[in-house]
């Protein structure tokens, strides 16, 4: 069935046993229902800060469960997420934000001086966690690149923010997969594979920071079926 990406947490919360874990980072675990409710709160908080369908939202957060609450909240607003490293120097951040022109920046550094921003530790207190209904975002993601010129670019993925739940996902990621992500979510591949695991109703084991020994332990502990490594990670393992 084709559904909005924004509805993925609710879709699986309603179909999986109560308390089923969707995402873990270390000891921090998030069930499908928690992901749905927390993303709904954030979506309403973002809308209160002016985010509208068709907008771009820059996410400058480290790897963690909050990142996914935020990305799903952006889709629930009918907007498109862009992931940036939260440690980006002020000048580089300013150049990227000038190209992107996001309606909101979530996280990042205080010296980015974004006109509309929320801090890394923002908590959406006082907002309803009931389902949110908004138009589907025209682009499911917009990632940044310096490319061969070194000048910041925003690369739009022209796939709308919808997903087919009745078939296996891209890259051979099967339904109910156990997937490990050791890479930073501001890179395109980790962003894609991590969210694709969730689109498939799988369990995502995320790493805050890559560690070779911990990677092998997590693979064994969680019966991981799918992981993406870059060559430097393979060398360290």
Place the predicted regions along the sequence by residue.
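Conserved AMP-binding/adenylate-forming core of the ANL superfamily
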Residues: 21-64, 91-94
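Conserved structural elements of the adenylate-forming
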Residues: 36-41, 153-175, 235
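Conserved AMP-binding/adenylation subdomain of ANL enzymes
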Residues: 164-178, 186-226
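A short helix-loop-beta submotif of the ANL/AMP-binding
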Residues: 56, 62-82, 86-90, 100, ...
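A short N-terminal helical cap/helix-turn-helix that marks the beginning
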Residues: 1-21
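Conserved AMP-binding A3 loop
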Residues: 31-33, 139-164
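Adenylate-forming
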Residues: 62, 110-112, 224-237
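Structural core segment of the AMP-binding/adenylate-forming
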Residues: 48-49, 69-72, 76-135
């Amino acid at each position: 069935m084709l559904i909005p990406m924004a509805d993925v947490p609710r879709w699986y919360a309603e179909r999986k046993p109560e308390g089923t874990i969707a995402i873990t980072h270390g000891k921090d675990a998030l069930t499908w229902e928690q992901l749905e409710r927390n993303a709904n709160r954030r979506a309403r908080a973002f809308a209160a800060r002016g985010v509208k369908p068709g907008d771009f939202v820059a996410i400058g957060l480290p790897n963690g469960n909050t990142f996914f609450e935020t990305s799903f909240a952006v889709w629930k607003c009918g907007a498109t997420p862009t992931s940036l490293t939260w440690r980006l120097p002020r000048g580089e951040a300013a150049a990227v934000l000038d190209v992107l022109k996001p309606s909101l920046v979530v996280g990042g550094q205080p010296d980015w001086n974004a006109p509309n921003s929320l801090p890394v530790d923002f908590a959406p207190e006082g907002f309803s966690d009931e389902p949110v209904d908004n138009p589907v975002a025209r682009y499911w993601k917009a990632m940044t690149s310096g490319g061969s010129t070194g000048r910041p670019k925003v690369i739009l993925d022209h796939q709308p923010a919808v997903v087919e739940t009745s078939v296996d996902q891209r890259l051979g990621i099967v339904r109910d997969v156990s997937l490990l992500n050791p890479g930073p979510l501001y890179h395109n591949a980790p962003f894609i594979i991590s969210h694709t695991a969730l689109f498939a109703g799988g369990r995502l084991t995320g790493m805050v920071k890559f560690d070779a020994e911990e990677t092998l332990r997590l693979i064994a502990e969680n019966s991981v079926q799918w992981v993406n490594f870059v060559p430097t990670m393979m060398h360290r393992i």
